[in-house]
């Protein structure tokens, strides 16, 4: 197929868009692939849509290869199925809700577990129908509080979601592994650098869960890898190694001190060392102190009377050398929503003294206290004494205070012990491109799905859920592959295989370029032909670099000697070949083979 730039709906821009935050967003807009409609909502222009469709084709091929069958659900969905699973409430503000003219509640689908479960219940009733894997490539909607980075974090996006239904857990494991391998095939074919990480399930529910994270310095997800094993995990899923409990007997009594102007950990440590306080004969460090962070918890789960538990305060205890990681805290508290207490909360609760909050004061006022797993019995801490300019030294867990529970809320630091006991953790950044879950029977039980099993009894099938961010992959590939000159697309997803540029006004050169374009097209290559008559060679070259086709063929000054120039955008190579060798050289370059 041949597409002439003189006829292509395309406008490239020389300046970066004002709202762009990451390089891929800037280049996709400048190169005319996407255009912003509203925050987190984008239109796909011809070049961008071609990339998107190419990625969808790879995804469909790999899903079909594992026996999955494609269906399609609407994006506009009724409320009732999401009430059945509780997710109408659990999704909180992230859900787009609307009403029809009859005042009935609807939503724009963020994900479709409920619908897949319902359709399987309505169509199948015997174990002979199982296992089954269904998938769709569908537009999803989530009302992100802060949409950012263009199509990397949008409010409308395209996702491939698939669901497996099996009669037993062994079958679920097989379906899970099929998807795991299919995802590896997809991302390998797309040329993406990625890591497979243990993850939390969040509002999806279920047990086993893994994320596929594209490695990116500006990714919004932090993940860790062990220096001595294959362990990798999203930082939200890292489980703290719990130290052994310490003996309580014989420890000195806790002592309260006047600590003027010591609202920060840094100031508290400085005060302690100026007073000559020591810990096991050494100077006090930040890790010897205990931060007490006050949070608001909005819990949608129901109490014994069937009412939502609603909003309450809680205190989170973490060692003073670590910050509270809100993502880890949110993951630990699911499905509750959490946020830091604000000035109004402190004014409303005078027992909360900012900078001096401690676990004893919280417990005395009925506030739930959640501790980092390192706060084991017998550990001694310097922490707030619940009065301005006062701290307590030697407050011992299990003697002077007892947490109501434990929570993974402290930030993970470079060099922390690996949870598998092998080596230490190294931090990296990534962008989530895929997520696979072993959901179990959460949804099939909620919808009372009963299937006749081999023994003649009614059994509840088990589910898996598997997602790929299809539209996000466009941004991820752009982000990983771009260079200083523009986009660079791998051949598997590029809008066109070859970009032919006429850079010679000679009529014979123009005719030869047309003939070359037809030769390439007749051999099955997708060709973008820059035939614009009133555009200078310099502008054409700039556009060819910005647009990012894997191979650029220039019919320029060298044509007088029977030569054309090949520019490989992926390797950076530029070289001349005989005009008659342009086709085989182009095919070799697109296969990624080295020059002979």
Curated annotation (Swiss-Prot):
E.C. number: 6.1.1.15
CDD domains xrefs: ProRS_anticodon_short, ProRS_core_prok
One annotated GO molecular function: ATP binding
Annotated localization: Cytoplasm
Gene Ontology terms: biological process: prolyl-tRNA aminoacylation
The organism's place on the tree of life at top rank: Bacteria
A GO-annotated cellular component: cytosol
Record's catalysed reaction(s): tRNA(Pro) + L-proline + ATP = L-prolyl-tRNA(Pro) + AMP + diphosphate
Principal location listed in the UniProt entry: cytoplasm
Record family assignment: Belongs to the class-II aminoacyl-tRNA synthetase family. ProS type 1 subfamily.
Comment on protein domains: Consists of three domains: the N-terminal catalytic domain, the editing domain and the C-terminal anticodon-binding domain.
Subunit structure: Homodimer.
Protein name, as recorded: Proline--tRNA ligase
Organism: Corynebacterium jeikeium (strain K411)
Gene name in the database record: proS
